[in-house]
């Protein structure tokens, strides 16, 4: 089967799904809303999201519940996308699904650390997916992080997490987080190798960029919040980055402070976009999402009969959810409309 034939149907479906994205004009109207409830009413009455909110009491929906509703819809759309593929391509997208599954694992483990009684499956976005193969009920029934990790015995997750110390603190959670990311990208890179050459090259570039940006986050957080040694931080960085190779990684890890870290970063492709020494953390996250968004929009425009359109849709849909939930959250506070623009991961003309 040619690439044109393979992608004709799925790209047509994806383009139809993309038309449901919010327009810049709709974003402007959300920003102009007076409060959280007004935003919900606008989403319900003036956008495609109204179909998702049907049947819910808008007066009772909080930010977390809205994010859950949006993510459950995303997972359904993800399943629709996978339906178009078979063989190694279906395996590839199933590996991508692991990214959301491990978020649910993280949610449970963090709950065990904080003492939150998160024993409700309805808080998890992947538990009822046909792609899910984890026993979340068993994890939720445990009393602490150590027991929850042992509840994963027999799964790929357990192989990576079993050596994590039973010490329950923020640093342990950080180690769990980076270990899960290492696991995910290890499996993802293996599945990419099974794609055809064109798609393999595209995905290696995309994933290599993600690894670069994730490594920057690891290094920054390890230095600022956990005071980890350069050796420890370097040990947790991921291999396979596109633009930041081992020599540059070492310089970043061994930089003495955030200012020197940023100076080394300026000598990379990302330095002028990601500014840790200047911006607050939420602005850095916004800039990273903006960079990712621009990459996918460019790929979608330049590549037609390949994997770019599908992956761009899946990633841009996630960014839209982040934009919506960010705006919803800050509508609780009295922030000028002009200031709200800086929370979005793209520019509004």
Question: Where on the chain are the PLM-derived regions?
Answer:
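N-terminal domain-start signal
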Residues: 1-349
